[in-house]
């Protein structure tokens, strides 16, 4: 465990904020103020872009773990609330896709570059929580596997399948990849494909 902030902690915090902003985008589109306030009271948002302002430096790992859990559970809670209100998954996916299109254009010259971009953006728990690896790489396709799906526990807590999360993730990444003419597909919840 680290006793001081290192680049990996800022990298993780950026990923947490990206996930939180997706939740906010969905909330803004579909929830009224009272419903947003309820989500905030149950699962308070991180209020600063500056990690040093908010983190408990005496418990860096524990604080980051709690922040990951909080952003994941809030997202699952909001999605369940929307589905219960009759908002279609397709409509929620449109918001996720649009959020993906808001990212700046990065230097992507290969499928490996696209994969590395995803590793910098997607929140899959702390590095100690998950193992992700490329299992197949060809000229026009790169397949990777997520060995420990941390999202499942949060969606299951609200009686949803992890596949709901992965459909939303697919929409978000396809929004992100639109400017590169790349596609992202869930083969199954644990296997992902990036293709030209």
Q: Which role fits each region the language model picked out?
A:
Residues 138-189:
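Short, hydrophobic/π-rich interface segment
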């Amino acid at each position: 465990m680290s006793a001081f902030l290192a680049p990996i902690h800022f990298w993780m915090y950026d990923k947490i904020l990206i996930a939180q902003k997706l939740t906010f985008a969905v909330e803004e589109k579909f929830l009224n103020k009272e419903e947003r306030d309820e989500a905030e009271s149950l699962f308070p948002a991180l209020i600063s872009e500056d990690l040093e302002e908010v983190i408990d430096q005496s418990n860096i790992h524990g604080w980051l773990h709690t922040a990951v859990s909080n952003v994941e559970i809030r997202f699952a809670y909001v999605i369940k609330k929307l589905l219960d209100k009759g908002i279609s998954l397709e409509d929620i996916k449109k918001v996720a896709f649009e959020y993906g299109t808001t990212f700046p254009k990065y230097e992507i010259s290969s499928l490996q570059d696209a994969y590395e971009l995803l590793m910098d953006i997607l929140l899959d728990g702390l590095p100690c929580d998950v193992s992700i690896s490329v299992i197949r790489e060809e000229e026009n396709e790169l397949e990777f596997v997520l060995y420990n799906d941390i999202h499942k526990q949060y969606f299951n807590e609200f009686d949803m399948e992890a596949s709901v999360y992965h459909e939303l993730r697919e929409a978000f990444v396809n929004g992100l990849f639109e400017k590169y003419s790349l596609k992202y597909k869930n083969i199954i919840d644990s296997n992902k494909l990036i293709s030209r």
